[in-house]
Every structure is written in C-alpha cells, then in structure tokens.
Design a protein with these regions (language model features):
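Beta1/beta-strand and adjacent pyrophosphate-binding region of the FAD-binding site
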Residues: 2-18, 36
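Glycine-rich FAD pyrophosphate-binding loop
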Residues: 11, 25-49
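A conserved beta-strand/loop capping segment in the N-terminal third of enzymes
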Residues: 31, 58, 62-114
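Conserved N-terminal glycine-rich FAD pyrophosphate-binding loop of Rossmann-like flavoproteins
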Residues: 41-64
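Short beta-strand to alpha-helix junction loop
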Residues: 52, 96-118, 192, 242-248
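Predominantly flavin-linked oxidoreductase catalytic cores and closely associated redox partners
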Residues: 119-263
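FAD/FMN-dependent oxidoreductases across multiple families
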Residues: 241-324
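C-terminal helical "tail/cap" subdomain of flavin- and related membrane-associated enzymes
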Residues: 323-397
Length: 397
C-alpha cells in the first residue's frame, strides 16, 4: 500500500457545522492534536436549509466561548403556526429546559458555516477546501489511509480516526456499506430567498412562520425572517408521499408563495431556489465494522423528523465524539470510545427523536393538525411543548 504524506490524529470529511465543531472540540480538548478537515466546496458556500438556529446551537457555541459569531444578528422572538382552515397561533419562544438562551437566529448558511469553519482555522486545524473524499482503507498498523482529490491532485493522508460529516449523500457512509434511509424516513424540501418589505409589519414582530397541511398536505412550509427584508422560505414533504402523489417541488413552492401573498406578505425577488433531501433520525444507521470510522450530522441521519432541523444535533455529535475519543487516539480502545459516543448520543436524544417522529405522524393528518392547534390555542403548556420539540430536547412522558 502506498504510504501517506501526512499523519493526522483526526481526519474529518465535511466542513459544515457538524464537521467544523468536531474539529473545534478535538482541538479544545487537546490542543496538541493534529486535526484535518476536508470539504469538496470552497468556502464561503451556500447550503440549502431553513437557516434557523435555536438555543441548542447557541449552547454548542457557548461551550467553547464562540457565541461572538452571532453578534449583530437580529433575534427572532416568536413562532406563528398556521393549519388547515386558517387556524393560527402566535407564541413567544418559551424558556427551554436544557439551555441558557431561549433565542432563535436566522443566518444564511453561506455566512454561518463559514464563521464556524473560521473558528476551526483559528485553532490551527488543517483545512483542505475543494477536495473530494475518494476512499479509505486500513493499513497494516491499524491506521487508516484516506485518499482525497481535486482537479489537479490526489493526496493520501494517514489518520487514527476518520469522521464522515459529509451530508445526506455521504461517501464515507457509502464505503461503510451503510444503507441510505428508506423514503419513509426522508423528506424532500426546497428553499428560496425572497425580499419582503412588510413581513415584520404583517406579523407585528420578528416571527418564524410555519404552515402545516396547507400549501403541502402532509408537509409544512416556512417563512423565516433574517436581516433587513431578507426571508428564507421553503416547503418540505415526506419523500414517500412526494413520490406516491407525483408532486412537483417547484409547484409546491409557488403555491406557498401565493399563500404568503394572500396573507398580505409582499414577495419580491424570489431567488436561489434549491431542493435537498433530509434523512430523518427516525432511522439512524448502525455501524458494525471495527475500523475506526464513524459518522456525524446528516451523514448519520440526525435530522429532527418533526422540524427538519439538523445543525444542533450534528454539532453536539461532533462534541460527544471528541469527548469520548480524544484521549484514546493512541489506545487499542479507540473503537470502544467510538461505541461510547454512539451510546451517549442515543441516550441523550433517543426519546426526543421518537417523540418528534410521533409528532410528525400526527401533523401529517389535517384533522389531527386542526385538533392540536385548537387545543394549543387555549393551552399554553401544549403550544410550549410543540415549540420545545422544535427547538429543544423535549420528549413525551
């Protein structure tokens, strides 16, 4: 086997929030580690997403005093939920049980991801932008040899642990022979940006708007206000329903834009429409191989099945992985440390994910959506719980 040019303690494929936070966590827990971070894109780069980050992401940033990257961003103060027959509820974001802050920001991923990556660069993480993952194989001494490439070069690096944080279509996951989620455990969504000079006037404040079972039956649409007049809008539906009913994602987005206009929202300059897949955490992969390779973030199907949010879970996974393995990188027990990370993540989020999956089933029924919103309109605890499923780690008891 051809030898590698550099040996890393940790090599991470994918420099989104999950991968970058994993790199940050390893360096903060042990600054002497040699950490490499690889991404096929050159940053800053766009990423299709709703762009909303809540208390979980803020808490993950605060762990290592990195919350300063959120300075000067406007805070979202409420949520507005619409259901069938125009049932609507507006509610201030409640104090969540597990976090210091009950705050939401809407920051385009082209900015947010670049800021988090720069935090990793500041810690002297070696970053390789514009390089794609090719393959890995185990060397005779149990180290991993990882090949990456760009248009001009093929490079081989050695590493003690390889982390796949390379998204819903993870190449690392594919080489591990871990199947993709079935259509039942995935959604398809489309995001666009618009300008709206009167959105804050219509909703009286900076509010996240969710529309359930209106523009997309058995799915939901969103409008999230960012800086100035900028809004992130989009719509998502379960992939199984999307295929069965032969829906058109662009038509669904247009239907939602028309709904916004019916509510009085001025919609201007629709742009940057981009569709994407969301692998839900209702079907998380089990890695049975004994090589020191693991997955985090979308590559490991960590997306909330109710909200479609994945940034927080991916960032926490990166931290938990570093916490459970940073002191085992030269130990024969490294693989046990990877197993400890999986157990820790599952213990923390399993009941939450199950509760969100059940909520998803309820919200796929227009009848049940109407009932839930009617109850919530008269019961503060119910609406608070729904919001905590979206933004915290709440679960049914």
């Amino acid at each position: 086997m051809q030898k590698y040019t550099n040996l890393y303690d940790v090599l991470i494929i994918g420099a989104g929030p999950a991968g970058s936070n994993a790199a940050i966590s390893y360096k903060k827990l042990n600054p002497t580690l040699k950490v490499g971070l690889i991404d096929k894109a050159v940053f800053p780069r766009d990423k299709s997403c709703g762009d909303a980050i809540g208390p979980g992401v803020i808490s993950a940033l605060k762990r290592f005093n990195n919350e300063h990257i959120l300075e000067n961003e406007p805070q979202v103060v409420s949520t507005t939920l619409y259901g069938p027959e125009n049932i609507g509820i507006q509610n201030y974001i409640p104090e969540v049980k597990n976090k210091e802050d009950s705050i939401v920001y809407v920051i385009p991923r082209i900015d947010l991801d670049n800021r988090i990556l720069n935090l990793a660069k500041d810690l002297e993480v070696d970053v390789f932008e514009g390089y794609s993952f090719v393959s890995f194989e185990e060397d005779i001494d149990k180290k991993l040899v990882v090949e990456i490439k760009n248009d001009n070069h093929n490079l081989k690096f050695g590493t003690k642990i390889l982390i796949g944080a390379d998204g819903a279509n993870s190449r690392v996951r594919k080489q591990l022979n871990v199947k993709k989620n079935s259509d039942w455990h995935k959604a398809i969504a489309i995001r666009a940006y618009i300008d709206s000079p009167n959105y804050l006037e219509i909703f009286k404040e900076r509010s996240l708007m969710f529309e359930i079972n209106v523009s997309a039956e058995k799915g939901y649409a969103w409008a999230f206000p960012s800086k100035g007049n900028l809004l992130n809008i989009g719509i998502g539906v379960p992939l199984s329903i999307f295929k069965k009913e032969k829906l058109d994602i662009n038509e669904l987005l247009q239907d939602f834009i028309e709904q916004l206009e019916k509510r009085g929202v001025v919609v201007e300059n629709v742009r940057d429409e981009k569709s994407y897949l969301l692998p839900f955490a209702s079907s998380r992969p089990k890695i049975t191989q004994k090589v020191n390779v693991t997955l985090i973030g979308d590559a490991s199907s960590m997306i909330n099945p109710m909200s479609g949010e994945g940034i927080f879970y991916g960032m926490e996974a990166g931290y938990l992985l570093a916490k459970n393995t940073h002191n085992l990188l030269d130990s024969p027990d490294l693989n046990k440390g990877i197993g400890s990370y999986e157990k820790a993540f599952s213990k923390r989020f399993k009941r939450h994910y199950l509760s969100c999956a059940l909520a998803r089933l309820v919200l796929q029924s227009p009848f049940m959506t109407k009932r839930l919103l009617k109850v919530a309109s008269n019961d503060q605890d119910t609406i608070d719980f729904v919001v905590e499923l979206l933004f915290d780690e709440a679960y049914l008891t």
